[in-house]
């Protein structure tokens, strides 16, 4: 793939606010390339700092303007087709229920597989939930983020369900739950 063709194609998507791509997205965007050629082209684009490999199979277009939700966009791309929402320590720190703010970590509940993904922007920690979709939708709110955000009581319940450490919880803030 020619570098200029790649930049022009990726620029079109970035103008629509899209800057995080799964390998399968790129395979569809550059369908004239064989998988082997595409992998070699992606390596060249990463080596020339046009793309950054966020995690296995997920790439971020460096020339695109980015919002403050890059980890959430990466999460959505990693677990496309699954329900995912910010919860646990990340949500509770936003609500002021726990005393420490996780600076380099995003904690997310997902109906997909759990796992930890180290990216150049921080760590994404995915924890599997078997909660029904209706419970997930009722226990979350829409924000400016590309993925939903747990309500305070949902995040607290998730923290207790998965057996996480609760010693950072500010009990004075729990009275509002």
Segments from the language model and where they lie:
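Nucleic-acid-binding surface
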Residues: 62-177
């Amino acid at each position: 793939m020619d570098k200029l063709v790649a930049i022009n194609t990726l620029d079109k998507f970035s103008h629509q606010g899209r800057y995080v791509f799964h390998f399968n997205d790129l395979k569809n965007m550059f369908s004239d390339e064989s998988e082997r050629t595409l992998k070699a082209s992606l390596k060249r684009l990463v080596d020339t700092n046009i793309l950054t490999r966020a995690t296995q199979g997920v790439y971020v277009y460096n020339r695109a303007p980015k919002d403050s939700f890059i980890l959430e966009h990466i999460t959505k791309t990693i677990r496309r087709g699954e329900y995912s929402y910010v919860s646990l320590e990340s949500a509770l720190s936003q609500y002021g229920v726990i005393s420490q703010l996780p600076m380099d970590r995003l904690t997310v509940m997902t109906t997909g597989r759990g796992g930890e993904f180290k990216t150049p922007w921080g760590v994404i920690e995915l924890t599997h939930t078997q909660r029904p979709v209706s419970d997930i939708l009722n226990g979350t709110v829409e924000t400016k983020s590309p993925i939903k955000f747990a309500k305070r009581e949902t995040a607290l319940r998730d923290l207790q369900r998965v057996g996480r450490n609760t010693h950072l919880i500010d009990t004075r803030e729990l009275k509002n739950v």
